[in-house]
């Protein structure tokens, strides 16, 4: 009995339980914050993070004390020894030449993605920078600005919009504070795009290593090199391997999760199970919307664990799987509890309401396979490329490539289900995206195609599995086709992403003011800028905000009185159609002169700049 109590698992979980229990007993319940939250909710106002966060951290702590008790209760199961591997299949190695090809692929990706590091941030990136990383700028009544650092509580828990991919944002802010030095010159950058994109670029490089390691774990090493070379040309690499969002981290973490699960099932070792649990938490911390991937991967794990013929191995692995997921749950609850209510509020707003039609599925398949859409999304926009109408080769060739790339993935599925040790993997490889799509259908939402990014690793793995089963000559013939198909299909889209920003916010602001740096002593003098929805954000924090045509007219009168030029900088004309009076005013050539239309690389990222004619002579 005493020896069981001294078991490392028992001692560690009992220790965790008592640490959490003592913390709960010592830390005061945030009663004042609870009252303040209740008061603001009763008034129909949003609670401040200062009061909201302590309330939910305390509630999360209460739940975690109970979950820690469950960890202790699992001791009879979790402390069992693993007498043999639960999953057959030793780790395979890549040859030196194959590693060189993987390294070459990573280098090609880095060269193609590097030009995007310094591009202007686009809408979601800019919103993340403005709310969670860059210094906060307050526009005073006299037009001057006050600047203060962003509080870390905003970085960690500001979830008014799900643009805050928290696990990424923390890393991005640390990079930004380490690499960026503020200046006071007229056009010195107020923040650094490169600094916040660099960790994503590094994670993109990590995709290649993580895919290779994952495939070695599962015994698919032979197919890695050609898929790595194809991956280097995928337009989603150029986009999401650089974008200042958490999607680059998501892809890396999904590759790691599949590899960690493989090692955990093969060895039963605690380090792999705990690593699996930690990686799951980090994936959800980066992007809660990626939950479909770990859900289906865990279902895969359950099937694999309970299909083992050895009862002792089944019980031992089941215990470790439960502990790993309990650790994930405790970390999610302990760290992310404060975002629960804003996340639910966002879902209730139904920002992506709609339905999935054939066009959506065709675009989704095209994006997933090569990173470019099948249909053109913007008539007259030079950035609106598509495989059907604007690809490097003809529409017929593009269709052939897509069909054959899909067929190669189908071969991968066929090979997976033929092997007893991997027969459950399609639950994740196919079931993951199927669950996300089912969720969208039931919820009557029309998600962006990039919401499929958590399953992009599944496609890559299916290609690897398919190639790994070919003999040498067939492997390299099929591999060469894969590389050519992806690179040729994605060429135009990748080239456009390298050449120009997705949204030219920085460039639009430069058209309106000579002094663009809020830290300059003469900032906001001799000029007025105005913006409403889809505003320039932290590129132009001195812009006066308006919500109605009356407020815009007040700014026009103010510009007349002060005899300074007034510019209006706005994006996504479709959204302004919900403010028809404002749009009619801005489109009146007697009142406003069109300065520029800056095309964007997405339906909502074209920007327009107009100048009020009443002050044009000044």
Label each PLM-derived region with a short phrase.
Residues 2-15, 93-101:
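N-terminal membrane topogenic signal
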Residues 6-17, 21-81, 109-477, 483-614:
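Membrane-proximal helix-loop-helix interfaces that form the catalytic/acceptor-binding platform
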Residues 80-88:
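Charged, often flexible domain-edge or linker segments that flank or initiate folded functional domains
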Residues 87-97, 317:
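Interfacial transmembrane-helix boundary/kink motif in multi-pass membrane proteins
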């Amino acid at each position: 009995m005493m020896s069981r109590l001294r078991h490392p698992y028992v001692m560690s979980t009992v220790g965790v339980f008592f640490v959490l229990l003592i913390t709960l007993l010592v830390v005061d319940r945030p009663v004042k914050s609870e009252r303040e939250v209740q008061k603001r909710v009763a008034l129909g106002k949003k609670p401040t993070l200062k009061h909201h966060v302590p309330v939910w951290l305390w509630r999360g702590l209460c739940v975690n004390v109970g979950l820690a008790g469950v960890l202790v209760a699992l001791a009879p199961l979790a402390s069992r020894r693993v007498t043999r591997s639960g999953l057959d299949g030793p780790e395979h190695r890549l040859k030196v030449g194959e590693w060189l090809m993987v390294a070459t692929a990573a280098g090609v990706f880095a060269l193609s993605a590097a030009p995007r590091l310094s591009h202007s941030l686009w809408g979601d990136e800019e919103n993340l920078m403005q709310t969670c990383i860059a210094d906060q700028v307050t526009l005073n009544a006299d037009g001057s600005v006050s600047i203060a650092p962003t509080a870390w509580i905003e970085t960690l828990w500001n979830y008014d919009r799900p643009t805050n991919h928290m696990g990424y944002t923390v890393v991005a802010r640390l990079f930004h504070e380490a690499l960026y030095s503020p200046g006071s010159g007229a056009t010195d950058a107020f923040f650094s795009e490169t600094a916040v994109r660099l960790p994503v670029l590094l994670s993109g490089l990590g995709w290649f290593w993580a895919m290779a390691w994952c495939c070695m774990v599962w015994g698919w090493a032979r197919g890695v090199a050609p898929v790595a070379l194809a991956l280097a040309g995928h337009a989603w690499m150029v986009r999401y391997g650089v974008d200042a969002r958490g999607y680059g981290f998501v892809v890396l973490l999904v590759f790691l999760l599949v590899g960690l699960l493989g090692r955990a099932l093969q060895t039963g070792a605690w380090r792999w199970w705990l690593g699996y649990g930690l990686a799951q938490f980090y994936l959800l911390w980066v992007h809660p919307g990626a939950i479909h991937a770990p859900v289906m991967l865990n279902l895969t794990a359950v099937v694999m664990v309970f299909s083992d013929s050895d009862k002792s191995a089944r019980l031992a692995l089941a215990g470790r799987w439960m502990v790993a997921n309990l650790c994930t749950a405790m970390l999610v609850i302990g760290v992310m509890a404060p975002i629960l209510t804003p996340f639910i509020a966002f879902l209730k707003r139904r920002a992506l309401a709609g339905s999935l039609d054939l066009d959506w599925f065709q675009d989704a398949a095209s994006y997933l396979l090569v990173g470019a859409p099948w249909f053109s999304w913007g008539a007259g926009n030079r950035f609106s490329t598509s495989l059907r109408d604007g690809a490097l080769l003809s529409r017929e060739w593009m269709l052939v490539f897509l069909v054959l790339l899909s067929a190669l993935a189908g071969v991968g599925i066929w090979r997976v289900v033929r092997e007893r040790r991997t027969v459950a993997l399609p639950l994740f490889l196919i079931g993951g995206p199927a669950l996300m799509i089912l969720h969208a259908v039931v919820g009557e939402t029309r998600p962006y195609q990039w919401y499929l990014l958590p399953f992009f690793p599944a496609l890559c793995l299916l290609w690897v599995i398919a190639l790994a089963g070919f003999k040498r000559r067939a492997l390299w013939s099929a591999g060469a086709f894969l590389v050519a198909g992806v690179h040729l299909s994605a060429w135009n889209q990748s080239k456009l992403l390298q050449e120009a920003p997705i949204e030219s916010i920085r460039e639009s602001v430069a058209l309106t003011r000579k002094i663009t740096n809020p830290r300059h002593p003469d900032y906001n003098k001799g000029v007025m800028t105005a913006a409403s929805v889809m505003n320039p954000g932290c590129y132009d924090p001195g812009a006066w905000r308006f919500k109605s045509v009356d407020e815009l007219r007040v700014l026009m009168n103010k510009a007349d009185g002060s005899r300074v030029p007034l510019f209006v900088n706005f994006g996504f004309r479709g959204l302004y159609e919900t403010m028809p009076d404002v749009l009619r005013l801005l489109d009146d050539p007697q009142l406003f002169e069109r300065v520029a239309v800056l095309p964007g690389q997405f339906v909502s990222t074209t920007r327009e700049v107009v100048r009020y004619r009443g002050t044009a002579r000044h």
